[in-house]
Amino acid sequence: MFETLIPRFPDYELIDSGDFEKLERFGRYVVRRPEPQAIWRRTLSEEEWRRTADAAFLRDARSDERGVWRLKPQTPDRWTVGYDHAGMHLRMRMGLTSFKHVGIFPEQAANWNFIYDNCVRMRAEGRTPKVLNLFAYTGGATLAARAAGADTTHVDSVKQVVT
């Protein structure tokens, strides 16, 4: 039997991956985007991927990193998803970027839980946690710390976020 340590995240699902792409659900919307680490064959057919995806990232022929999103009608380019853990209730804004990102990194959920749980423990011990989140990017870890009552400082300087 194969076990994973992935936290419960009802607003996220990895539907399929392979052939250097991944098909993911964030809330009610399914996105198709490049994934260089998905070196295996996908399970679902190309037709199923096309039919399922509400948004698909198309790479710019002149750039390995940039591209555009093709959206089905009625698919927004921004929406929110929720994430809950042990009293932490996060609402995070999804946003489709020109460099294939969507606004969060769901694989970081275990880290959000760790940060939240440790900040809650520190507060229970009478200490005020102080969190300096460098390279903070989308902010999931900062939100988790703040939700637990930590004093937080969120810093990032990735060019696409600053400009």
Locations of regions flagged by a protein language model:
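N-terminal accessory targeting/assembly segments
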Residues: 1-6
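Single, functionally critical "micro-switch" positions that shape active/binding sites
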Residues: 26-27, 134
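Conserved SAM/SAH cofactor-binding pocket of Class I
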Residues: 118-163
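Short, flexible loop segments at the rims of nucleotide/cofactor-binding pockets, characterized by
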Residues: 8-10, 131
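Non-catalytic substrate-recognition/targeting regions of SAM-dependent transferases
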Residues: 10-24, 31-106, 113-116
